[in-house]
């Protein structure tokens, strides 16, 4: 799984060298942000169901057409799948917070996601909207410290950009 540490070590090994000063500074910065990332991961895990429901509800309220026949949320089974997928993205963000890199999202969430959604005729816009709602609603200190919130929002932005 890709993280800052594994990326640095892999690049240095491929070049047949030791990590450079810049490499080591990147690793050090990543380690210094670890406490904030772990706080964000803990808070997200504790509130995952509520965050997922609130974001999904906001999305379906903004795009009520999604519940019409022939759309992604035309019946409760499909609505439940939308919430499941949204929860999956949030869980992957949790994993990214733990490892300190985008590996979980890259490997399990983004690679091919747009192609799968396109093939199945599912729009990515509602997922982007739900994740954007989550990003914009989260605040410090209500939800987590400012540093933890910064880390959380950076991974939300990453997946939002990837699905846009």
UniProtKB/Swiss-Prot annotation:
GO biological process: photosynthesis
One Gene Ontology term, aspect cellular component: phycobilisome
The record's account of how the chain is modified after translation: Contains one covalently linked bilin chromophore.
Primary site of residence: membrane
Pfam family, one: Phycobilisome
Record-listed (2R,3E)-phycoerythrobilin 2 binding positions: 139
UniProt entry keywords in alphabetical sequence: Antenna complex, Bile pigment, Chromophore, Electron transport, Membrane, Photosynthesis, Phycobilisome, Thylakoid, Transport
Keyword Transferase attributed: no
PANTHER family, per database record: C-PHYCOCYANIN ALPHA SUBUNIT, PHYCOBILISOME 32.1 KDA LINKER POLYPEPTIDE, PHYCOCYANIN-ASSOCIATED, ROD 2-RELATED
Assembly and oligomerization: Heterodimer of an alpha and a beta chain.
Role description: Light-harvesting photosynthetic bile pigment-protein from the phycobiliprotein complex.
Protein name per the record: C-phycoerythrin class 1 subunit alpha
Source organism (scientific name): Synechococcus sp. (strain WH7803)
């Amino acid at each position: 799984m890709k993280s800052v540490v594994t990326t640095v070590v892999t690049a240095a090994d491929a070049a047949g060298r030791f990590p450079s000063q810049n490499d080591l500074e990147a690793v050090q910065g990543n380690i210094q942000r670890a406490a904030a990332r772990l706080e964000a991961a803990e808070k997200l895990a504790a509130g995952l169901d509520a965050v997922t429901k609130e974001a999904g509800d906001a999305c379906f309220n903004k795009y009520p057409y999604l519940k019409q026949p022939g759309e992604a949320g035309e019946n409760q089974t499909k609505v439940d799948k939308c919430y499941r997928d949204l929860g999956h993205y949030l869980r992957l963000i949790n994993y990214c917070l733990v490892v300190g890199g985008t590996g979980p999202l890259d490997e399990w969430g983004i690679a091919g996601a747009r192609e799968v959604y396109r093939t199945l005729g599912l729009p990515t816009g509602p997922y982007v909207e739900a994740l954007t709602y989550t990003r914009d609603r989260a605040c410090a200190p209500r939800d987590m410290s400012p540093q933890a919130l910064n880390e959380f929002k950076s991974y939300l932005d990453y997946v939002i950009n990837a699905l846009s």
